Every structure is written in structure tokens, then in C-alpha cells.
UniProtKB/Swiss-Prot annotation:
Subunit structure: Monomer.
Name of the gene: era
Assigned protein family: Belongs to the TRAFAC class TrmE-Era-EngA-EngB-Septin-like GTPase superfamily. Era GTPase family.
Coiled-coil intervals, chain numbering: none
Positions of the UniProt region annotated as G2: 37-41
Organism of origin: Clostridium botulinum (strain Langeland / NCTC 10281 / Type F)
Keyword vocabulary terms for this entry: Cell membrane, Cytoplasm, GTP-binding, Membrane, Nucleotide-binding, Ribosome biogenesis, RNA-binding, rRNA-binding
Residues engaged in binding GTP: 11-18, 58-62, 120-123
G1 as annotated region, ranges: 11-18
Domain of life the protein comes from: Bacteria
Keyword Membrane: yes
GO cellular component, one term: cytosol
Stated name of the protein: GTPase Era
Compartments, record wording: Cytoplasm; Cell membrane
Chain's role: An essential GTPase that binds both GDP and GTP, with rapid nucleotide exchange. Plays a role in 16S rRNA processing and 30S ribosomal subunit biogenesis and possibly also in cell cycle regulation and energy metabolism.
């Protein structure tokens, strides 16, 4: 008997959805940063074992949108809860349910498939706190399963996989067994660069950073030559991203190259520039160019 199912992971921004997906896959597939809303596109990630295949839709965090990009991200996350076989609602036990959590719960009540409550970061919180949070959420809605985990340390991840297998239906293998992601290489390369920029810039530049890959060519020796722009919204952000004597941009390129080489399994040369595009997050045509679907 072979089973297959589509799973979506929801939760407020920065709760650890991408880290959980990485722990399940044991691969660095989804951009992980300390900043909220760093996952912008629905990324279908495929886990294939001997007797099942799980297709994960990694979504942006659900939040109150402030611009066109925010609207896209919220709609993307809401749409992902439709037509799936299982929903994982990820929370942190050290945070009481806020308006964002209550908003998600109201949507989850309309879902016709099993919903798991997954408590992350249990290694960072006392058992009493975890138990208290469990009680609060259990009174808000009924969950098919409640699983405490540590995504970062991999605690109870195997248990979570076993429970997901239990709930998904019998079905075909939708993707080849060696396929782990349905996004193209350019998309992943752009996400790697953006992650490094977000990490290195910390609080110096607001969240309005995007990456466009201008060129990605592989020569006869198997070496990739990549060129791209880091987009920011204000002229004042540009020198911050570049850094003194180009030091910051050089570090972004260096750290990104290391991860891109690991992903492509090839030597990589990468050149990056910084370009100002004011209010790009409200520019529908530019969002489309960067790979964000048009809002319906």
C-alpha cells in the first residue's frame, strides 16, 4: 500500500515553519532568517519514502498585509490551506495566542481535513509553560493530533512523520523519487542570496529586499556564472547594503556562493549589484517579474 498527500504548514510569521520543513527534509530548502515573513513564495517540497510521498507547501506567515506583496503573501498562505490533505498549525509555547493566531484558527475551523497542533521550541520552554499553552489552544479548537517538537534540534520529527503517514490517504507517487523541490534553480539561487542579505544586514535595512537573477549560465567545465541584483526601496539603503569599500556586498556574495555551490554541486562565480526600485513591493508588474503570482 502506497500513500501520498499534500501538507501545508501554517502559523504566524517567524514561528519556525521553514526550520520545521528543513528538519523534516534534512535539507536546506526554504529560506530561513530571523526576520518575519522571509518565505515569500509557496514552495512545494517533496519527501519520498518507500511507502509514502508527502508534498509540503511551505507558505508565508499569515499577517495583516501592509502592501501588495503582503497581500500576495497572506492570500498565498490562505489558498494553501485549500485542497490539501493535512494542515500543520505551528506555534511557540512561550507566546499566548495573539490576533494573528486567532485569525488563523478561524480559518482552520473551516478546513475539511485533519489539523495538527505542533508546538515548536519545547527545548527552550519549561514543561509547565508547554502544558499551559496546550490547554489554551485546545480550548480554542479541536485538533486531530498535538505534537511537541524542537525543529532546530530535530526532536520528535520522526514521530511527526509517523503521524502524518497515518492521516494521509492512499494515492499515487506524484513526483519522481529523486525530486525534492518543484521550484527552478534560479528561484532557489535568488532565495539563498536574499537569506544572506537579510542575515548580514540585520536591522540596518528594512524588510524591503528582493533579488533578481539576471544571468545564470553553466560553461563547458560545469562552472556556473551567476549575475544578479539586490533590490532595495530607498537610495539611503544602497550604501548600507554595499558597505564600506564594498565589504558588505562582498560578504553577501561569499556566503551565498558557498550555499549555492552546495545546492548546485558545482563551482560557482557570482557577481551582485545593488539597485534601487522605489516601492517595488507595491509594483504589480515587478512582483510578477520576481515570480509572485498576480492577485485575483
Amino acid at each position: 500500500m502506497f500513500k501520498s498527500g499534500f501538507v501545508t504548514i501554517v502559523g504566524r510569521p517567524n514561528v519556525g515553519k521553514s526550520t520545521l520543513l528543513n528538519a523534516i527534509m534534512k535539507e536546506k530548502l526554504s529560506i530561513v532568517s530571523c526576520r518575519p515573513q522571509t518565505t515569500r513564495n509557496n514552495i512545494q517540497t517533496i519527501l519520498t519514502e518507500d511507502n509514502y510521498q508527502l508534498v509540503f507547501v511551505d507558505t508565508p506567515g499569515i499577517h495583516k498585509p501592509k502592501h501588495k506583496l503582503g497581500e500576495y503573501m497572506v492570500k498565498s498562505a490562505s489558498d494553501a490551506m485549500k485542497d490539501v490533505d493535512l494542515v500543520l498549525f505551528l506555534i511557540n509555547p512561550d507566546e499566548k495566542p495573539g490576533r494573528g493566531d486567532l485569525f488563523i484558527i478561524e480559518q482552520l475551523k473551516e478546513v475539511k481535513v485533519p489539523v495538527f497542533l505542533v508546538l515548536n521550541k519545547i527545548d527552550e520552554n519549561p514543561q509547565e509553560k508547554v502544558a499551559e499553552t496546550l490547554k489554551i489552544y485546545s480550548e480554542l479548537m479541536e485538533f486531530e493530533e498535538i505534537i511537541p517538537i524542537s525543529a532546530l534540534k530535530g526532536k520528535n520529527i520522526d514521530l511527526l512523520k509517523e503521524l502524518m503517514f497515518k492521516y494521509i490517504p492512499e494515492g499515487p507517487q506524484y513526483y519522481p523519487e529523486d525530486m525534492i523541490i518543484d521550484q527552478n534553480e534560479r528561484f532557489i539561487v535568488a532565495e539563498i542570496v536574499r537569506e544572506k542579505a537579510l542575515r548580514l544586514l540585520s536591522e540596518e535595512v528594512p524588510h524591503g529586499i528582493a533579488v533578481e537573477i539576471l544571468q545564470m549560465k553553466k560553461n563547458e567545465k560545469g562552472t556556473y556564472h551567476i549575475e544578479g541584483n539586490i533590490l532595495c526601496e530607498k537610495n539611503s539603503h544602497k550604501p548600507i547594503i554595499i558597505g564600506k569599500g564594498g565589504s558588505k556586498l562582498k560578504k553577501i556574495s561569499q556566503y551565498a556562493r558557498q550555499d549555492i555551490e552546495a545546492f548546485l554541486q558545482s563551482k560557482v562565480y557570482i557577481r551582485l549589484w545593488v539597485k534601487v526600485k522605489e516601492e517595488w513591493r507595491d509594483n504589480q508588474s515587478l512582483l510578477k517579474e520576481l515570480g509572485y503570482k498576480k492577485m485575483k
